[in-house]
Amino acid sequence: MTTALDQLKQYTTVVADTGDFQQLAQYQPQDATTNPSLILKAVQKDAYKPILEKTVRDHRNESTDFIIDRLLIAFGTEILKIIPGRVSTEVDARLSFDAKRSIDKAHELIKLYEAAGIERDRILIKLASTWEGIRAAETLQKEGIKCNMTLLFSLVQAAACAEAGAQLISPFVGRIYDWYKKQAGADWDEAKNGGANDPGVQSVRRIYTYYKTFGYKTEVMGASFRTTSQIVELAGCDLLTISPDLLQKLHDSNETVTRKLSPDALHDKPTERVAIDEASFRFQLNDEAMATEKLAEGIRVFAADAVKLEKLIEALR
């Protein structure tokens, strides 16, 4: 029997969401994504502590920020030895509301990759889908630096990213699901709100349909999954980035996977484009409590993990 993972790969580009690059080869993903939380998790494992220690040792007299950049590139370079495609490396979440500094940081990361012999076509710079992050992406894309827009929870964010010419977006399925489940509390009905009715799945389907209806080239990569059901319901999405735990479950499963999303079979097609000038963007995002709260929370979590990573580095000096 063909595994669920192999079936999924017939319809969707499978991406591994991890800093634990030793797990990559067995799943044969095309691309890989990282974020501050995943890098922090990886460097605390015995297998990866030597990378952290060597990076600190080699740059002991440099700033902590300087060392973190080189640590990100060290992980990205190792990942690119294993996968044929692209790796996503994230700009510090503390720059999420500063377009200029985000652009500057992206330039630094690209220069470090190029100095390591990695072509920029194999790199996606991850930026938070704030107004400022999207403006940074617009500038970077014009310079030939491809961007992956993360912490995306709403159609207005997706529309703004597409208008800015972003290479790729990462709508967060699981975190959307988490919010609605928490809001419902004891009234949550998993049977009613799971599968195709999962609010995170529905959000990605809506964004995918919007993009394909209006001919945007920006890639849609579902992210932040909690279950294999969420993944299977989005078979046919341009890309899906999946944790090693869920990749293993798909690998071990013989469940039949059928295509659920296709540009040739769009349902509930929108008739108008979303207004995305700055005032409209901010109002629409503010008007959607889930998106506003999860974006803010996501930035806080990634920023906090960046601080934890800094403390690990300081302890090794």
UniProtKB/Swiss-Prot annotation:
UniProt keyword Transferase present: yes
Enzyme active site: 126 (schiff-base intermediate with substrate)
InterPro entries assigned to the protein according to its UniProt record, in alphabetical order: Aldolase_TIM, TAL/FSA, Transaldolase_1, Transaldolase_AS
Keywords tagged on the record: Cytoplasm, Pentose shunt, Schiff base, Transferase
Pfam families: TAL_FSA (PF00923)
Reaction equation(s) it catalyzes: D-sedoheptulose 7-phosphate + D-glyceraldehyde 3-phosphate = D-erythrose 4-phosphate + beta-D-fructose 6-phosphate
Enzyme Commission no: 2.2.1.2
Pathway given in the UniProt record: Carbohydrate degradation; pentose phosphate pathway; D-glyceraldehyde 3-phosphate and beta-D-fructose 6-phosphate from D-ribose 5-phosphate and D-xylulose 5-phosphate (non-oxidative stage): step 2/3
Gene Ontology cellular component list: cytoplasm
GO molecular function: transaldolase activity
Family: Belongs to the transaldolase family. Type 1 subfamily.
Function recorded in the entry: Transaldolase is important for the balance of metabolites in the pentose-phosphate pathway.
Assembly with partners or alone: Homodimer.
Alphabetical list of NCBIfam families matching this protein: PRK12346.1, talAB
Protein's name according to its UniProt entry: Transaldolase
Organism: Burkholderia multivorans (strain ATCC 17616 / 249)
